[in-house]
């Protein structure tokens, strides 16, 4: 499945504005590059792409800008003359505007600052892609990893169990008052027990989920019913890694995978009646003129298994890991795009595809998790992925055409009505707790509505 071309019939100039987090390298950078390419190839000449990307510091903003402008120039050079935009108004073509902005999803004051800046501009966001995140690993169990590579390569690289998690990672204090109180304690030699403690926030949970969740709420004034909120998940978003009693993954044996399971639960249940109250609270939508206001839609995607720096390997081990990933693809694994650009296809598909291709498809066949899959020779496409408890489309036993039914997690169980009901119950509870956490932290940050 690829992004369809839109008609050239509409001549009124319009701007498609998309925000991508964590774009300085890896998947985030690849998503930005692919957005540029597919926008220029599929959208009419009357449309302009305003690509907003985030990084955590000014140097990365500048470096990413250079990379993206170089990519844009390369793409323009390859385009046929009829698709090549005029260069009279802006370097690199007037159909693409590239802008970098700062945010650190693990620092809530920067999340609020970003939202304040964008809302102040009043420019609608057509899509956001929540990609930024951290792994929370502290090393590799090399013996276990090598044994898995030698005996079960495809499975070991699709559902790895050899990364050593750093259990219990806690984010730095978020409120200025708490930070200044701690400083005053040091200066005045006051007993730390007299300083009110700030509730802990799981570092991985904050960077991967909650920072984006709050940003979604703060940016809600810029969303229209046609806007799209695209979450990036993982093939490793599996039930054993998540416990609803440990929402933030502070006790989880794999906080990264736990955070991605949270992502799946949030997105897949976002259109159910049981979560409607909480979703409307997040998006600030109630009733308008006696009618329930329409909401932007949430989508969830995953890039398959790609080679990025998130694992923190040195160059030597990184090379052999790359060899292993390609070998897994050559052994017919469907989930090894390897190249981040190929892995970006699912996120870009969810951001750019016309309404009749994606929204209507989910309305007919059910809500799905869209993954980046490849053939043996690397030809990439977008396909539905099974989500434990939800299935492929929210209907037990139904597998829509084009879904990937190989490379499955070995702990899976066949879909059932009970499993589907349990997934919804867990999702509704998760939404309730996320909304409670959001309101708590808005109060702590002095941002209550």
Please provide the spans of the model-predicted regions.
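Conserved NAD(P)H cofactor-binding loop of Rossmann-fold oxidoreductase domains
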Residues: 131-189
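A short helix-coil junction within the Rossmann-fold of NAD(P)-dependent oxidoreductases
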Residues: 122, 135-139, 218-226
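Active-site loop of short-chain dehydrogenase/reductase
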Residues: 125, 165-184, 201, 222-235, ...
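Amphipathic alpha-helical repeat scaffolds
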Residues: 24, 131, 205-208
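Amphipathic alpha-helical dimer-interface segment in Rossmann-like NAD(P)H-dependent oxidoreductases
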Residues: 207-227, 271-272, 276
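Substrate-binding pocket helix/loop in short-chain dehydrogenase/reductase
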Residues: 140, 200-201
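NAD(P)H-dependent oxidoreductase Rossmann-fold/reductase module
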Residues: 1-107, 113, 117-126, 135, ...
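Glycine-rich NAD(P)-binding loop of the Rossmann-fold in SDR/ketoreductase-type enzymes
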Residues: 106, 203-211, 258
